[in-house]
Structure formats: C-alpha cells, structure tokens
Amino acid sequence: MFTGIVEETGTIQAIKKTGLSMALTIAASKVTSDVRLGDSIAVNGICLTVTGFSDNQFTVDVMPETVKATSLNGLSKGSKVNLERAMSANGRFGGHFVSGHVDGTAEITRIEKKSNAVYYDLKLSPELTKTLVLKGSITVDGVSSTIFGLSDESVTVSVIPHTISETIFRTKAVGSIVNIECDMIGKYLYRFLHKTEQTKSNQTITEAFFSENGF
C-alpha cells in the first residue's frame, strides 16, 4: 500500500529487455537507505518488487502485462522517475489509498498556470472516468492528486509548485503519457453498485419469466 506522496525522484541507470518483459536499474538515495530484497517500491505509481540493490541503486523486474499497460516503455537511460516505498504500519498517511496497480495511461492535453497552481488536463478512457468524482482522488505517475474537472474522457488536476519541483511533473509537457490509478474506494463502490443493479435486473427478469409461465 502507498500514499501517493512521492519520496524522491530516481534516475534510470539501465534497462534490460527480455522478450516482452524488462528489468530496470534505478539510482536513488532515500528509498535505498533501508531497502531489502522483496520490498515493494512504486515507480511512477507502479508497484514493483526489488530484485537486487546496492548502496545507491536498486533493480526491479517488470512483467509483460505491466509493460503493456503502463508508460514504462517510454523510459530510457537517464529518465527521471517518481519513487515511493510501501507505507509502514506506523507511517504518516498523507495522501490517499494507492495500491500501485495502475489502471491505464492518460495523455496530457493542456497545461495552464493559474496563480500558485498548475492545471493539467488529462485525456483518458471512459472506462476509467466512470469510477471518478469531482474533488475525489486520482494518482498520476504515483502522485496523489485532486480532481477539479471531469468529463467522460478527461480529467483536470491541480498541482502546486512544490509538488512539481519535487516530482517528475517538472518534466511533463503537452503530449506526455502518464500512468493513472483511479481511487480504490471509488472503484469498489462502482463495482458494488453496478453488481447490485445487475442483480435486481436479473431478479425482475426471473420473476417475470416464472409469472408468464404459470408459476
């Protein structure tokens, strides 16, 4: 479990591709201070398992499905990435519940600075937006963000200058692809309500069927 509060940005040192999978070696300082084999670290919002490490770098394996569903294929040596260690039981909870299981990607279509905030318009699938709500939470490349605008195929988030300077938001431009994880609570609620509606519909059909057939 993560919070969406990025601890530091790391630098891609090496990318090893094997078939449809890959291994990433990432230079970092803070997240490697107490790292152990098997630890979970969110890389641009994606929960990945540490398979090797040294003093100032660590390696993670990326499965084919993760490569396909995220923006990791766009990384190259020298790319910056957002990093967050899994939340400890006694840690502070500063963002929102983030699983590290990315739902898909979005394209940045507009960036506008207003006063002390920067607004990002993100184009994404209606399959993702249907679980979102205004003023709700969404994770963008591992950053816990608040939704200020919402339509069937777009979301607007507002980011403060501190977050931009401390994360890879500072490298983003119109056309950039970002990883998206929708709010976990919203997804569960949508699933629950959708399944309840289906159950009611099925019950109505079944009762009508029996009635029409003399039962």
Curated annotation (Swiss-Prot):
Its Gene Ontology biological processes? riboflavin biosynthetic process
For this chain, the annotated S-S bridges are: none
Asked whether the UniProt record includes Repeat among its keywords, one would answer: yes
Q: Which pathway, per its entry?
A: Cofactor biosynthesis; riboflavin biosynthesis; riboflavin from 2-hydroxy-3-oxobutyl phosphate and 5-amino-6-(D-ribitylamino)uracil: step 2/2
Q: Which residues bind 2,4-dihydroxypteridine 2?
A: C47, L48, T49, D61, V62, M63, P64, E65, T66, G100, H101, V102, K135
Q: Which GO terms describe its molecular function?
A: riboflavin synthase activity
The answer to whether the entry has keyword Transferase is: yes
Q: Which EC main class describes this enzyme? A: transferase
Which reaction does this chain catalyze?
2 6,7-dimethyl-8-(1-D-ribityl)lumazine + H(+) = 5-amino-6-(D-ribitylamino)uracil + riboflavin
**Which keywords label this protein?**
Repeat, Riboflavin biosynthesis, Transferase
The cross-references to Gene3D superfamilies, in alphabetical order and at most eight, read:
2.40.30.20
* Record-listed E.C. numbers: 2.5.1.9
Please list the residues that bind 2,4-dihydroxypteridine 1.
G4, I5, V6, S144, S145, T146, S158, V159, I160, P161, H162, T163
Q: Positions of the Lumazine-binding repeats?
A: 1-96, 97-193
According to its UniProt entry, what is the function of this protein?
Answer: Catalyzes the dismutation of two molecules of 6,7-dimethyl-8-ribityllumazine, resulting in the formation of riboflavin and 5-amino-6-(D-ribitylamino)uracil.
Q: How does it assemble?
A: Homotrimer.
* Protein name, UniProt field: Riboflavin synthase
Name the gene for this chain.
ribE
